[in-house]
Amino acid sequence: MSKGLGILSAAVLCAVMVSTSLVAPVSAKMMRHSDTVMVGGAAMYPSKNIVQNAVHSKDHTTLVAAVKAAGLVGTLSGPGPFTVFAPTNEAFNKLPKGTVATLVKPENKATLTKILTYHVVPGKLEASDLTDGKTLTTVEGDQLTVRRSGGRIYIVDAKGGMSRVTIPNVNQSNGVIHVVNSVLMPG
């Protein structure tokens, strides 16, 4: 009986070890996959940079076109880290009619660059870092102010406009994106 119990114990131990070794890689893979966030119907992979991810979001085609027109692809593909408040296509659609078409013209590159770099803060700031009343200095040089209300995060621009963070903490290899529902305007 003792010999049979020993064999049974050894078999159970082997089964546990084998099942653990098979499950561990799957769990690690699932954990890496769970770090991805869906934005605009596309997975945003933490192993890719801001530009590599943004080009796949159907909600950010206007932003991507503007980044290309402003010549900021190289910068936002760089090492960073950056915190980007990324306006959706709907956010750009809230601007007066014709604004985006005017901004992407070569003669307006400086203005477009000013607006886009106003959405970028040096360093990686997670949602938990965006505390109520916190002032952020953008790459453009002006300030943004964080407001929290009802569990939501709002970013207030220099003109008093408020943009709500709709998808926080979209991690990138060179920073983090927070999707916002309005375009932020510098002073």
Annotated model-derived regions:
Residues 10-21:
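Bacterial N-terminal signal peptides
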